[in-house]
Amino acid sequence: MESEKILMAAGVTVAAVVGAFVFWGPSGSRLRQRRGQIAGLHNFGLTCFLNTLLQAMAACPQFIAWLQLYNNASPDRKSLITSMLNTLEVVNGTHATLRGDPYSPGAVLRALNALGWVIPQEEHDAHELFHVLLTCLEEEAIRPQPLGCLSDALPTDNDDNSSLAGTATPVGGFRSFSSMAAGLGASQRIGDQPNRPSSAMLTDFLNMEYDESTSLQRLVRSEAHTPDSPASVCERDGNDRLGSVLLDAVSPGTPFGFPLVSNPDSLATPMLGGERSSRPRLPQSQQQQDEGLNRRVSSSCRSLERLHRGPGRVSIWSNMMPSQVAHPFQGAMGAQIVCNGCGSKSAVRYDKFDSITLNLPPQRRTGLSLGHLLSEYITSEDLSDVKCDSCNETTTHTKSVTFAKLPACLCIHVARTVWLPTGQVCKRKDYVHFPESLSMAPYSFVQPHLNSQAGTPWGSTMSLYSSSLPMNNGVGGGEGFGTMFPKNLYRLLAVVVHSGEANSGHFVTYRRGSLRNAHRWYYTSDTIVREVSIDEVLSVPAYLLFYDRGQQRQLNLR
């Protein structure tokens, strides 16, 4: 009797626990609530300059979309593009599988090290690292993908190297040049050459030097051309026509399945893309024997062409480079010189930029705004004693500079480090008012009455003056210009603040949330994340400002 009561009580307890778990336990809704929450980042010791920049760039949806574009085109888990994308998605709480609060950005540091950047364990500038990251990301995005040798298109026989012409090898059975060289004996290599690794492995560190624009140390690499590198695929030694060799008869004793040709000049070089030009006619029996091989080689070349084409890839079978998508921080400044005597205008010179650096006025003053600094940035400059090519007179010329192409994401750097007459460096802590909505129309080349966009890659170049638009020098963000020029209206995404002195301190980031929390603002300092008000954000002494022109704007093609 007692045992039955105990058993019944145990059953009721288990049922109550199960019911509580079903009604109040973890559910999909709670997982969805965790999605989109901002995560902190581990500090490895003086790496706040990296954490603050990752938090700021994680608040830029268009930059993340650009990373996704190239990561989908050529995924490589050890590349900087993939490492950055994974880190930013984990920070935003949007990664499909990874979670972490705080999360370790060690993969980004390892990717930078693999690209040749050595970051000593000391304090660094976040603005310098910003340019380092963009430079490395752009190099990864536009560099040609490592392709195999033309011999990869040859059918192979796993048993021996004889009678390749009569073996029906599948088109998809490609082998790389390096793997073929490693599997053959020394007597089977062309000219008894030693085994050579692939070009991706032959990277020699020649010397160590410092880039003039940054204090971060970079190792300069030298890539050697090997037989499987794109630079040496189409031309080996003088008149050696490797492509025509592929289309000739294969002798049983030939290393790598290549025939030994005594007179390469007698052979015709095939056209890229799987086509070949006319060549001397072979004997009828040999022509029939090689007819099947030629068809397989041609189809293999076309298959390789399809495999190696795509966004961010360069195919050795095509003489046209695919269009590359520039990162969203890339813009262009336009400079033009006007003769004050005859009024002739020079051709517009365009210079690309990833960020703009605004200098503080020599004397500290109150009421300083971002509009004042932008106005000073594009102020015209008088050049004296310049000879005009039009009137041949030596007169004063006026040089004007404006934003010719506005980027999708705008990074503004407020330079706060100055040198004193004594030779010491100090940091200025002036407060610069910056708006949540910024219109760049007063500082750009804007001529609404012109419908023609011809003349330059950035539009018409009749003049670089922004018509008669007033400068946005007030404390407002120029909301009135936003209705006139909506494409030039930017919204604030993140603010990087440096606390401390010129030689030491700490970086923190104020940033927008992700997904449904994009209207909220968060304070991030390494592993610390807390929600703040927009008033607190607009009251901090900004060092780096991140703006964008809207989440749905299409990426610009170069």
UniProtKB/Swiss-Prot annotation:
Disruption phenotype: RNAi-mediated knockdown rescues the defective mitophagy caused by mutations in parkin and improves mitochondrial integrity in park- or PINK1-deficient flies. Moreover, knockdown in dopaminergic neurons protects flies against paraquat herbicide toxicity in vivo, ameliorating defects in dopamine levels, motor function and organismal survival. InterPro entries: Papain-like_cys_pep_sf, Peptidase_C19, Peptidase_C19_UCH, USP_CS, USP_dom. It holds the Pfam family UCH. Residues 39-550 form the USP domain. Residues 267-300 are annotated as: Disordered. It catalyses: Thiol-dependent hydrolysis of ester, thioester, amide, peptide and isopeptide bonds formed by the C-terminal Gly of ubiquitin (a 76-residue protein attached to proteins as an intracellular targeting signal). It comes from the Eukaryota. GO terms for molecular function: cysteine-type deubiquitinase activity. Keywords: Hydrolase, Membrane, Mitochondrion, Mitochondrion outer membrane, Protease, Thiol protease, Transmembrane, Transmembrane helix, Ubl conjugation pathway. Residues 280-289 have a biased composition (Low complexity). GO terms for cellular component: cytosol; mitochondrial outer membrane; nucleus. Its EC number is 3.4.19.12. It is found in: Mitochondrion outer membrane. The chain crosses the membrane at residues 6-26. CDD domains: Peptidase_C19F. GO terms for biological process: negative regulation of mitophagy; protein K11-linked deubiquitination; protein K6-linked deubiquitination; proteolysis; regulation of protein stability. Deubiquitinating enzyme that acts as a key inhibitor of mitophagy by counteracting the action of parkin (park). Belongs to the peptidase C19 family. PANTHER family: UBIQUITIN CARBOXYL-TERMINAL HYDROLASE (PTHR24006), UBIQUITIN CARBOXYL-TERMINAL HYDROLASE 30 (PTHR24006:SF888). This is Ubiquitin carboxyl-terminal hydrolase 30 homolog. The lineage of its organism: Eukaryota, Metazoa, Ecdysozoa, Arthropoda, Hexapoda.
